Amino acid sequence: MSRRHKAEKREINPDPKFGDLVVTKFMNAIMLHGKKSVAESIVYGAFDVVEAKSKAEPIAIFHQALENVAPHVEVRSRRVGGATYQVPVDVRPERRQALAIRWLIIAARKRNETTMVDRLSGELLDASNNRGSAVKKREDTHKMADANRAFSHYRW
C-alpha cells in the first residue's frame, strides 16, 4: 500500500434506464473486454425476462436478490504462533455489495441455460426467493464463520 497518496474513488454514473448506481456496478462487473453495450443489453434483457416472469418491478427484485446474497460475516486467515486460524469478521457495506454482485454473476455463469440473459434472470429470480447457488454460497460463508466463532477474539 502506498504511503503517499490514497487512491481516489472513481465517480460512476447511474445507468440510463433506472438511474441506479448499483445497476451500473453490476453492468461493469458483467462486462468483458470493455464491451459495455453488450453488458448493458444482457442486464436489461435479464430485467425484461424477470419482469415478464414475475410480474413485478425488476429493479425491486434485483435489490432483493442482492440483499439475499450479501454476506454479513466472513472468515479471514490470521496467523498466531505457527497456527493459522479462520477468524470471523463483519463485512463492510461496500464489500458486502461487491461480494453479492460477484457471487450472483459467478452463479449465473455456471447455470445451464443457453443465453446469459436467461441465466442471469434465472439466478436473480432464484436469489430473490432465497434459492440458487449464490444464496448457497452466502449460507456456506455464514456456516464457516459460525463454526469458527471460537476464534473471534483474534480479531484485528
Swiss-Prot record:
One of its GO terms (biological process) is translation. InterPro entries: Ribosomal_uS7, Ribosomal_uS7_bac/org-type, Ribosomal_uS7_CS, Ribosomal_uS7_dom, Ribosomal_uS7_dom_sf. It comes from the Bacteria. One of its GO terms (molecular function) is tRNA binding. It holds the Pfam family Ribosomal_S7. PROSITE patterns: RIBOSOMAL_S7. Belongs to the universal ribosomal protein uS7 family. One of the primary rRNA binding proteins, it binds directly to 16S rRNA where it nucleates assembly of the head domain of the 30S subunit. Is located at the subunit interface close to the decoding center, probably blocks exit of the E-site tRNA. Part of the 30S ribosomal subunit. Contacts proteins S9 and S11. This is Small ribosomal subunit protein uS7. It comes from Allorhizobium ampelinum (strain ATCC BAA-846 / DSM 112012 / S4). The gene is rpsG.
